[in-house]
Each structure stands twice: as C-alpha cells, then as structure tokens.
C-alpha cells in the first residue's frame, strides 16, 4: 500500500540522512541522501559518491618507471620534481577516521592528489609550477574516475583548498583522482618550459654491433674513419653518414636528433669539418653544412647556462654578448664575472682572462669577491688578485694605502671620487710585459674593436671568382668594367698610377707617329733623288719641323729605343706645350692621317686627345681607364668586392627564382706572370668558387715569342696556358667559365685574316648559304666564335677524367660566353657566372637526392 501511495505523489522531497560508514545497506541507502524519484522529475541534487574502500593492492600491477641509465643523463639538464603536498585539515583530529586494513591506509584518510599528464621534459624546472595545479572541489561521477590506459602521469601536485566545517562533515571523504590531459586545462606548461627552450632530453646512442663498428651497418672497427653525431655521439662510416644524417640542415646530426640541443662537449668542434666530409661533399655543400651547424638556433648556446655576475642571461643579453665588437672567446656554460666599465671578463673565483667590449648591458652587478682577490685594493668595486697588483706596480701605479681605483676601458685610471685621471695603464710597455708574464689579458688591437657591419651569423657567404688569362687577353678589361658597372671606384692613389701609365703610353703612341714621319721623309728624299714625283702628302718639305721641335722629337725616339719613356710624365708640365706644338705641325698631322688605319684602336683613342692628356692637370675618366693598356702590369694581384644590383626582369620573377641582392662576390684579377716558378702561388686560390679564363678571339692572327725565344701563334700559347690551368692540382674540381673576348674586333679581323691561319683551326670550314639575307646564315664572326668555343670544350673534355661521386660518374662542363668592349656584355658574362654557381649547388643537391633515393630503394628491396 505504501508503494502505491508513493507512486501517486507528484513531487517528493529528498530526506537527508547521515552517512553511516559501518552500514551494509544497498547502494541507495549508503549514499549521503535518501532520494525518492517521480516519473516526470529530473534529479537536481548533489553529486553521488561511492563509499571509499580500501582494496588490496597487487604489487605486480603497480606501474613503475624504467631504471634511468647514468649514461643517458645529459649535462646541464635538470628535471622538474614537485614534492607531494598533503592537504591541510585543521578541523579533523589526527586519528579521526584513519584505519589500517591489511596493512594499507584507507583512502578516506588520505589527501587528494591530482596527477597531471605531461609529455615534455624541459631543461629547467620551476618551483612555482606545482602550485598552479588545481584540484576540483566537487567530486564528479564515477565515470570521471576512469583512467585511460594511455594517459601519461606527472609528478606535479598541489594542495587542495580545504572546505568549510559543515561541507567536510556532510559531503564525506575526499578521494584520489587521476586527471586526464584534457582535464588539466589549468596547468600552465610555460612555467616549466621557457620560450625557445623546449628541447626534449635525449639519450646517448647505443651501439648494437661490436666495439668500434658503425652504429647503422655494424661494420668496421676502431680504425675505420667515422663521422660523429654532435647530439647523441653516434658514429657512422663513410657509406652510412648520408643515410643517417640526410641533408644535414643543422649540421652533423642524425635525422632523429634534428631539433635537439648539441652535446656541450662538442661545441668546440662546431664548424670544423672532418676529412671524411671533405671527401664526401663538394666545397659549396661543405660551406653550407658548416654554416648551418654554427648558425642554426638549435645549436646555439642556451642563454640560461651562462651566468654573469650571479644572474643568468636572457636570449637578448646572450645575443648582445656574442655580437659585440670583441666577444668572449670559447664561451662555455658556467659562472662568469664581468666589469662593465673596463671590460674585464673572467670566471667566478679566478683572475681576468680577457678584456671584452665594455658597456654591455648584461648580467647583474659585480661584487667585491668575484675574482677571489685578497689584496684589499679595488678596481671598479672588485678586489683584485695578486698578479693584477703586481702588474699595476710594474706600470707605475701607486698602490700604497689600499686605494680604490676607477679604470676606464682605454686604460686611464683615477681614484674613486676624483674627476681627473692620474695616468694610463696601457701606455707603459712594462704593463703589457707583466700581463704576458702573469697570463693577464691585454686590450684588443684597434682592428679587433671595430664594429661589424652585420652580426657574424647574418653575414652572407662570399663567392670568389678567379679571373685569369693571357697577356692582352681581355681579363684586365673585364676587371675594369666590373668596377665601373658596380660603382666600385678606384682610389686616388690608383688613379694617379693609372694617369702615369696612360701618359707613358701616350708618348709611346707619339713615338710611333714620329718614326713613321722619319720613314716617310726618307722615302720622299729617295724619290726626289731618283727624279720621281710623290703625292702631296709625301711632298711635304723635311724642314717643316723647326729645330726646337726636331730636337724634342729626336729625344722621344731615343728614349723609346732605350725603353725609358717613363721620364716624360713627371715633366708633363714643362713638356705639355712642346707636345702640343709638335702635334700641330702639318707634316705630323699628315703622317698621322696616313698611319691612322694601321694603329691600334686604343692608340687612336688617346692620340685624338693628346693635347688634353699631355697636361699635368689631366684626370683620367672611366672610359680612359677602360681604354688604357698596361694596367695588368700595375700589380700582379687585384680584387674587387661587389654585389649585383637587381634588375626589373629579375624583380618580375617569383621569390624562389630571385637572387639575393645582398650576396657578395669577389672578383680576383690574377696575372699568370706573378705566380712564380711552377705556379706555386696558385695554391692561395684553392677556395675560389669559379675560374673565369679569358681568351682573345683575335689571338689566332697574332704571333708572340715564347720563353725559349721561338715565335709561336698566340692562340696556341693561350691553349697551352689553358691546359696548365685546368690540370693544376689547386684548381681540381673547379668550375670553369671560358670568356671569349674582343668579339667586336673579330668581326673586322676575320675579314682580313682567315681563321685557318692558326694550325689548330685548320679544319674550320663552315657551310655558307647562297642566300646571304637568310636568317639561318649567321655572320662569319659568329660562326668563328662557336667554332672556337667548341674546340676549347673538346680540349677540356679530353683533359679531364670523369669524376666519381657516391658511386656515380659524371663529366665536368666547360661554360662559354662572349664579351666585347660594351659594358652590357661584361655584365651578362658576370651574371652568367652567378647562374653557374647557383646551378652547381642545385645540381649537386638534386644529384644527392637521386643518389640517396636510389640507394634507399635498393636497400629496401
């Protein structure tokens, strides 16, 4: 009957009832409330909690961590461990409700502990992070107590906020909860991992094979050459290093170690390649790998491991320290002290080891005992050591009375509280001698403290272009054009030397005209004596030159025979008027007009301006410098640094195909005559990225005298020079660009002298179309250019043997282009050299990818 009545009641109310811990009732009566339900009502009461029970624990079922190997512990890494904090409960007596059953404590008497899942191990821990974890004040349903088997546990815990007296007594006991990762939203991982330092801990690699074997293929022994990973210390043989390390985007690291911090014991070897890598990689690849190993972020020294004046550095402070004009040498993790005023730098408890750049805003304030001094004499608030005191005495500094000195970065010192300096420590040579005796630092040289234009890690690579060629082969013209094109002007001293060379050449050209004039006079006198009548030009009377000009003309011819025309430019102020008067003589003008077509082009250029150039105030223009001969003999070696300006055509390309406008190039002009015996000095240019060899297209029609006094064709002599360059050991495996110069002169020369004049080109027999207007009928000069380039390519292929790399062989290529006197052609040739360098890098990378892919495919099959 009671059950029927209860079903008819629409809104029953809950009847709270005290929880009886010793009762054995069913689940409904064991809860904190006795609740009656209606069919249409929704339960809105408090949460339901199970009665906590102390169940027997199976020890074998307890999850335990694997034992930690001491070899896997990395130096400089500390792991966050938070102690277990018990709940404060001032209302509960010590023995209230605590019972032991079967040796285990009832969970009702324990504290609530929240275990938070983590999967990141940081190199630093925070003591405050354990206080940020909150335990829910309300106990959720039993479904929330289920722990996922894959949920990771953490050792972080915090104290639960205690409840008020009534709630503690009414709600019941607290329970142990395991919070899954999605429930730990209030856990702030930033307290454990600082920005940029979430580097996972790594273990040292374990060798599976015998001692000394490769970690990948388990072959080899202790004497086998191997490459070592700078993170896990794994060692790989020559055949496995590329498979294990891949493209090495962060240097010599295993592919699994990319992104991890390096072993600090290997920091000194960063950027120092091994002999294996030199054989394994090309020069450009090796530079890229070593540069990435030094500059990548993962390999940088952690700032928190550098402690200066009892304060760990931040990333900005470490950047300031490493990029200052004179940074500390071989910086390693440790405690240092730094005198910001004088620049003294040293380890805590030791004397100064270096003088770095002063006034760097890094670290804390220096203390008195940082260098462990015991002299009671202070410099900038630091008690100095005995070796420093001895150095001060040698420098003549009065140290009686335990003074306190204030020393500036330049070495000037004064007593504290005084305005005027007493003297300068480094002005005395005895001070530097004392520093050498007692191993104390001295100020850096002036060149060492000059500020860098850009930080070291931001400096671009410098591509070196070696420019070489035969005498008058056009290499000097290309060098001068490059300076003019890329706005690298000559210095005042160089312009004075160029002016001297141009004026000396001018007297050489004038002597050529005077010699022709004397020869024409003799011919005219012979014709007159034989009764023949000459033309109007030759009928000029021989006494048309007055005695003063005749004497000057004979003087010029005599000095030309003696090879001493260099005496005229210094006296240009006195001789300028005489040269002008001599040049205005009608007989000399008639001789010049008759001789003009046979003179060299640059001689005609300067003789047309003889009145201007012969003056003492003459200043050579860019075109004068370009037309001048003999500048290659001005110095055996000259170089110019430049960068290519961006063109509108390049700017229209996508960013992936654009060149870096900040990339620097160095054009080195080398005269072969300055290389010494057996070209020993050529070893200085082993780091050249590209060799530009210049050949004049008109050399086939000229003859020169070789070292033995024999007359040989100049093109054959250039061919021999090219062979010697290509086969020289210092230029092995270098890319060559053949630049055929003087193409504009070839168009004139080939009409007068056929190309088959040179015996090397005797098989030149181009097909000539009958239709001269056809676009498929190129000019003879263009045909000759392609033929000469083809001959040099055949010669290049016959000299060099195939190069073997990673099991494949390939033939090096000879690149060819043409230039003339126009500046555009020189600019195109140098930009072509830039493209060759880029192609070489991309081609090598693609070749490596293909090689690695084929090897991996064969190994997997």
From Swiss-Prot:
Stretch list, region G4 motif: 737-744
Domain G-alpha: 461-853
InterPro entries given in the database record: Gprotein_alpha_su, GproteinA_insert, P-loop_NTPase, XLG_GTP-binding
GO BP term (any one): G protein-coupled receptor signaling pathway
Cellular location(s): Nucleus
Tissue expr: Ubiquitous. Strongly expressed in vascular tissues, root and shoot meristems and lateral root primordia.
Ranges annotated as biased composition (Low complexity): 146-156
Taxonomy, superkingdom: Eukaryota
Composition bias type Basic and acidic residues, residue spans: 131-143, 157-168
Role summary: Guanine nucleotide-binding proteins (G proteins) are involved as modulators or transducers in various transmembrane signaling systems. Binds GTP with specificity. Plays a role in the root morphogenesis by regulation of the cell proliferation. Acts as a positive regulator in resistance to pathogen that triggers the salicylic acid (SA) pathway. Promotes the DNA binding activity of RTV1 specifically to promoter regions of FT and SOC1 in vivo leading to the activation of floral integrator genes.
Other facts: Dark-grown xlg1-1 xlg2-1 xlg3-1 triple mutant plants showed markedly increased primary root length compared with wild-type plants. Dark-grown roots of the xlg triple mutants also showed altered sensitivity to sugars, abscisic acid (ABA) hyposensitivity and ethylene hypersensitivity, whereas seed germination in xlg triple mutants was hypersensitive to osmotic stress and ABA.
Name the UniProt record assigns to this protein: Extra-large guanine nucleotide-binding protein 2
Organism lineage: Eukaryota, Viridiplantae, Streptophyta, Embryophyta, Tracheophyta
């Amino acid at each position: 009957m009671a059950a029927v009545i209860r079903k008819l009641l629409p809104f029953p109310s809950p009847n709270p009832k005290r929880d009886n811990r010793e009762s054995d009732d069913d689940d409904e009566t064991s809860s904190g409330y006795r609740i009656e339900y209606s069919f249409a009502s929704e339960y809105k009461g408090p949460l339901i909690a199970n009665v906590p029970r102390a169940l027997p624990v199976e020890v074998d079922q307890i999850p335990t961590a694997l034992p930690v190997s001491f070899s896997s512990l990395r130096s400089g890494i500390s792991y966050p461990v938070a102690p277990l904090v018990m709940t404060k409960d001032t209302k509960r007596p010590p023995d209230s409700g605590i019972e032991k059953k079967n040796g285990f404590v009832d969970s009702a008497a324990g504290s609530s502990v929240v275990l938070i899942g983590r999967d990141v191990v940081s190199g630093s821990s925070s003591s405050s992070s354990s206080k940020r974890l909150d335990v829910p004040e309300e106990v959720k349903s039993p479904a929330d107590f289920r722990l996922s088997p894959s949920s990771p546990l953490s050792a972080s815990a915090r104290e639960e906020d205690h409840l008020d007296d009534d709630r503690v007594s009414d709600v019941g006991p607290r329970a142990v909860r395991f919070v899954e990762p999605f429930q730990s939203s209030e856990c702030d991982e930033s307290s454990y991992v600082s920005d940029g330092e979430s580097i996972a801990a790594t273990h040292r690699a374990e060798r599976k094979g015998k001692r000394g074997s490769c970690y990948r293929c388990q072959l080899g022994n202790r004497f086998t050459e191997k490459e070592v990973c700078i993170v896990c210390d794994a060692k790989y043989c020559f055949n496995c290093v590329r498979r294990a390390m891949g493209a090495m985007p962060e240097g010599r690291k295993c592919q699994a170690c990319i992104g991890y911090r390096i072993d600090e014991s290997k920091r000194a070897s960063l950027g120092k390649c091994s002999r294996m890598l030199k054989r394994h990689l090309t020069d450009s690849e090796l530079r890229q790998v070593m540069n990435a190993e030094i500059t990548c972020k993962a390999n940088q020294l952690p700032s928190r491991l550098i402690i200066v004046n009892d304060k760990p550095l931040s990333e900005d402070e470490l950047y300031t320290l490493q990029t200052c004009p004179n940074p500390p040498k071989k910086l390693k993790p440790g405690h240092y002290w730094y005198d910001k005023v004088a620049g003294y730098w040293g380890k805590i408890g030791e004397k100064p080891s270096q003088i770095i750049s002063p006034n760097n805003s890094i670290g804390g304030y220096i203390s008195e005992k940082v260098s462990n001094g015991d002299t009671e004499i202070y410099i900038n608030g630091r008690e100095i050591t005995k070796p420093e005191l001895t150095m001060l005495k040698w420098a003549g500094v009065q140290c009686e009375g335990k003074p306190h000195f204030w020393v500036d970065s330049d070495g000037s010192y004064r007593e504290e509280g005084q305005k005027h300096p007493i003297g300068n420590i480094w002005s005395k040579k005895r001070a530097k001698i004392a520093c050498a005796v007692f191993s104390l630092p001295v100020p850096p040289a002036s060149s060492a403290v000059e500020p860098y234009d850009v930080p070291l890690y931001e400096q671009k690579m410098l591509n070196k272009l070696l420019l070489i060629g035969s005498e008058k082969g056009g290499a000097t013209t290309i060098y001068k054009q490059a300076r003019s094109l890329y706005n690298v002007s000559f210095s005042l001293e160089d312009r004075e030397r160029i002016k001297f060379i141009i004026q000396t050449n001018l007297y050489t050209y004038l002597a050529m005209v005077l010699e022709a004039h004397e020869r024409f006079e003799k011919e005219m006198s012979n014709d007159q004596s034989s009764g023949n009548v000459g033309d109007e030009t030759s009928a000029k009377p021989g006494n048309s030159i007055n005695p003063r000009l005749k004497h000057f003309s004979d003087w010029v011819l005599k000095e030309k025979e003696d090879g001493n025309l260099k005496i005229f430019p210094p006296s240009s102020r006195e001789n300028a008027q005489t040269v002008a008067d001599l040049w205005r003589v009608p007989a000399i003008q008639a001789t010049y007009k008759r001789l003009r077509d046979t003179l060299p082009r640059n001689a005609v250029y300067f003789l047309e301006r003889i009145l201007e150039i012969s003056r003492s105030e003459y200043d050579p223009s860019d075109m004068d410098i370009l037309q001048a001969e003999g500048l290659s003999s001005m110095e055996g070696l000259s170089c110019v640094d430049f960068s290519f300006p961006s063109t509108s055509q390049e700017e229209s390309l996508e960013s992936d195909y654009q060149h870096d406008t900040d990339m620097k190039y160095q054009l080195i002009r080398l005269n072969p005559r300055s290389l010494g015996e057996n070209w020993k000095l050529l070893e200085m240019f082993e780091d050249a990225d590209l060799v530009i060899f210049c050949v004049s297209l008109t050399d086939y029609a000229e003859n020169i005298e070789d070292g033995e006094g024999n007359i040989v064709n100049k093109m054959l002599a250039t061919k021999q020079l090219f062979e010697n360059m290509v086969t020289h050991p210092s230029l092995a495996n270098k890319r060559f660009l053949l630049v055929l110069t003087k193409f504009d002169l070839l168009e004139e020369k080939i009409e007068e002298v056929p190309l088959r004049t040179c015996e090397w080109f005797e098989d030149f027999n181009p097909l000539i179309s009958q239709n001269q207007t056809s676009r498929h009928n190129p000019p003879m000069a263009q045909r000759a250019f392609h033929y000469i380039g083809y001959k040099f390519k055949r010669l290049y292929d016959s000299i060099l043997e195939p190069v073997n790399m990673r099991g494949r062989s390939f033939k090096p290529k000879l690149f060819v282009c043409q230039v003339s006197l126009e500046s555009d052609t020189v600019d195109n040739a140098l930009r072509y050299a830039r493209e060759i360098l880029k192609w070489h890098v991309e081609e090598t990378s693609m070749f490596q990818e293909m090689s690695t892919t084929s090897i991996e495919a064969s190994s997997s099959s």
